């Protein structure tokens, strides 16, 4: 199944195999999430969404609903089949940015964040049960996950590297000066995280332990990985995508029929 998202009035909806997530783009924080979206009822409804046209009025009404977010509300939307049609919005994008499911940042400094990360022993299982499935023994899921979870703490303080790997699931590569995010596939992300973090504990005060890559390094990795990736993910920030990865642009936007 493809993953889709819509964006309207600073709100973003992510619909995928793992769940439904609502993200507040203006305040950069998640609003709500519903796990286990791969159940029979959801699958049945999802196919109906593709074929039923949705008017702007219906979209506006739905957006107003999720401004008061909650898991119960998202569940109700699924049950009543009021989720808007993705194609009807002409916003059919493959999207796998899991920031939507994360909790707001509680750390105020890099040091506090490092201490919070180092407090885990690597066996911590996130409350939604999604971390452990993505890692084997050589990865410390909780540390990496929390590092991604609180990226706002240090991302805005970084001005030198063009790209910074912050997401161990889908490689959210960011251009700090423009505050843009480019999500890529999970396999590439794991490769970058593994390469950049050799030690068990991650200390954000020691930036040499966190993988930083230049534009040319990034493009080379993209080329090397392009033949092995089994799930495509791409950014909605067209200007960044077109500038740095033009070859991927058509593929990632589905123009070559890649599933």
What are these regions (language model features)?
Residues 1-2, 6-259:
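Alpha-helical structural context detector biased toward long hydrophobic helices
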């Amino acid at each position: 199944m493809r993953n889709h998202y819509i964006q309207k009035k600073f709100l973003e909806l992510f619909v995928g195999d793992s769940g439904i997530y609502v993200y507040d783009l203006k305040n950069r924080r998640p609003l709500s999430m519903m796990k286990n979206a791969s159940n029979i009822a959801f699958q049945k409804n999802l196919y109906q969404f593709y074929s039923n046209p949705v008017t702007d009025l219906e979209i506006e009404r739905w957006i107003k609903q999720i401004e008061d977010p909650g898991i119960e509300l998202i569940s109700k939307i699924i049950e009543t089949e009021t989720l808007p049609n993705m194609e009807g919005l002409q916003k059919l994008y493959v999207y796998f940015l899991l920031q939507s499911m994360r909790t707001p940042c509680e750390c105020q400094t890099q040091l506090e964040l490092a201490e919070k990360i180092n407090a885990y022993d690597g066996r911590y299982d996130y409350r939604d049960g999604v971390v452990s499935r993505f890692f084997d023994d050589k990865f410390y899921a909780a540390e990496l996950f929390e590092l991604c979870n609180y990226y706002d703490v240090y991302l805005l303080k970084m001005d030198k590297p063009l790209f910074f790997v912050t997401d161990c699931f889908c490689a959210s590569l960011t251009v700090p000066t423009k505050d843009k995010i480019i999500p890529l596939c999970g396999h590439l992300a794991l490769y970058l995280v593994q390469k950049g973090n050799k030690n068990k504990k991650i200390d954000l005060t020691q930036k040499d332990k966190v993988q930083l890559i230049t534009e040319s390094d990034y493009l080379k990795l993209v080329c090397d990985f392009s033949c092995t990736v089994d799930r495509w993910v791409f950014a909605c920030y067209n200007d960044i995508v077109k500038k740095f990865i033009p070859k991927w642009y058509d593929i990632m936007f589905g123009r070559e029929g890649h599933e």
